[in-house]
Amino acid sequence: MVKGLYTAYTGLINEQNRMDVLTNNLANADTNGYKKEGATSQSFNDVLAYKIKDTSESPNIAKKLGTMNLGVKIGENYTDYTQGSFRVTNNHYDLALSGNGFFSVQFTNKAGDISTKYTRDGAFTLNKDGYLVTKDGDYVLGTNGRIKLDPLQDFSVDSLGNISQNNRNITKLKITDFEDYNYLEHYGENYYQPVEDAKTKEADATVYSGYLEASNVQVVQEMVEMISTSRAYETNQKMIQTFDSTLQIASSQLGKV
């Protein structure tokens, strides 16, 4: 009975994690280039249950009853890198990638440490010094480092990521792709960073100027999954309440027999 209580408890924890992921997806449904996440669950290893003190069998032999599952545990959260739809902005600072690859960004944390992060959010602008930056002020990287432009002159970006101004090629966007996206992890609101053993490869993405990639979150689908998760959570709650009532009866009344 106590094992059943524990099984319901692990179910609650699992559904809560799933709900947190779904809620975060919905919160980022309007975030440019956001990739939705999902949650997995795994069962604990089954264990053998034994019948003890059975006078019908030899007292020295425990009889197997079968297997007993100890509930579920949280598996891994994963990212769905499916490309989102494009929307037209007609703003030449807005860039979108069609195909595999990420914009490279120079990120500085609160401690002043500098590292390269990756994003599909191409909503860029110029800072006061004329550098191309993200909405958070992080520098967008080209093949030669930070990208500096003349704010008083128009510029263009071709499909290969070449940036030109005054009929002169300035630099090329540093678009990075990875051999295995399982070696990427979410960082902050809308960045990704490689983990150990991540390997880069040449990106095959096409750059579109004046467009932004929307998130790949399907709001209706996420809401349906939230309802399903909520029902599963309620079921586990009721199971715990049932076990609690049964244990209370066992402790208060069976002792009187």
List each model region and its residues.
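Amphipathic alpha-helical polymerization modules
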Residues: M1-V257
